[in-house]
Structure formats: C-alpha cells, structure tokens
Amino acid sequence: MPVVETERHGQVLVVRMNRPERLNALNHEMRNRLAETWTEFRHSNELEVAIFTGTGRAFSAGYDLNSVAE
C-alpha cells in the first residue's frame, strides 16, 4: 500500500497521506514521497491546484517519532 496516493482531476492534484493506522504520521518514506510529489506539481504546466488530505480519521498526527528510532 503506497504511503502517498495521488489523483488528478483536470488541473487539480489530490495528494492523500495513507498511513491511517498511524494517523498519517509522517515517516522517512512518506516525507520523501511528499517532497517528490510537490516537486512534480511545481514543475507541471498542467496542474494548478494541489489538495492535501489524509486517509481515515486524521489529516496527520505530525512526525512519527517511533520511525526515527528505527
């Protein structure tokens, strides 16, 4: 299951953080994927709007400190 999912709707890019079991807390993989997605969006001539959302009941609980210890 990808930690970041994207959907395009015309000129709109929907970016969904997808770690609902951790309340979408960021880990290294998610941070990197979000950075890549943002770079792709910024350099796109076709996309005008980016919407960030989270899967499940939370947008994001912040950074997953347990993943830092691993």
Regions found by a protein language model. Give the residues of each.
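Conserved CoA-thioester-binding segment of acyl-CoA-metabolizing enzymes
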Residues: M1-T55, A61, A69
